[in-house]
């Protein structure tokens, strides 16, 4: 009876120690692998060429939840270059209903990040057609079309409405890595 009790005790200790070690290893490596998973999702999105699929991953920590979403938008022909375009949306917050969105339009040339337009939020619907970038704002119910034939501008100004005498709207910045 003493041998059976001793074996059960050793087994339980082994399981507890084994679980603690694997959990701590996962947590230590979690911060290193977030960027790796983001890069893999970007690659999948670029290779899919399917604008009806959204690739996403949710990462939870003790006090924060981050949702990363990638959607293929299409390709832009600017001069002789053919840019692949994806939308990156990062929802971040302590709770699901209090998350804030950071949306960017990312341009890739020959599989490498060329640059991105930042400053967008969750109120924008983005559409790509040949050499045009079309933005629609759900909140203001306004739309703008940007023709990108010759070059990529450093700033895009999105007016809230055309009838307003004051220039009110959003500015999106183009950042290069």
Model-derived regions: residue spans:
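Acidic, small-residue rich beta-repeat scaffolds with periodic aromatic anchors
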Residues: 20-56, 127-177
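Surface-exposed acidic loop/strand-edge motifs in secreted or periplasmic proteins
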Residues: 41-122
């Amino acid at each position: 009876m003493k041998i059976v009790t001793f074996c059960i005790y050793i087994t339980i200790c082994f399981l507890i120690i084994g679980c603690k070690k694997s959990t701590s290893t996962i947590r230590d490596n979690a911060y290193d692998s977030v960027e790796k998973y983001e890069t893999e999702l970007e690659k999948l999105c670029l290779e899919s060429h399917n604008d009806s699929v959204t690739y996403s991953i949710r990462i939870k920590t003790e006090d924060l939840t981050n949702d990363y979403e990638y959607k293929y938008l299409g390709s832009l022909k600017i001069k002789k270059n053919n840019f692949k375009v994806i939308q990156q949306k990062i929802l971040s917050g302590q709770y699901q209903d209090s998350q804030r969105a950071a949306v960017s339009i990312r341009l890739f040339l020959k599989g490498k990040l060329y640059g991105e337009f930042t400053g967008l939020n969750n109120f924008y619907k983005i559409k790509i057609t040949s050499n045009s970038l079309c933005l629609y704002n759900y909140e203001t119910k306004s739309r703008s079309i940007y023709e990108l034939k010759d070059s990529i501008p450093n700033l895009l100004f999105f007016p809230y409405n055309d009838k307003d005498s004051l220039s009110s709207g959003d500015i999106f910045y183009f950042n290069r890595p």
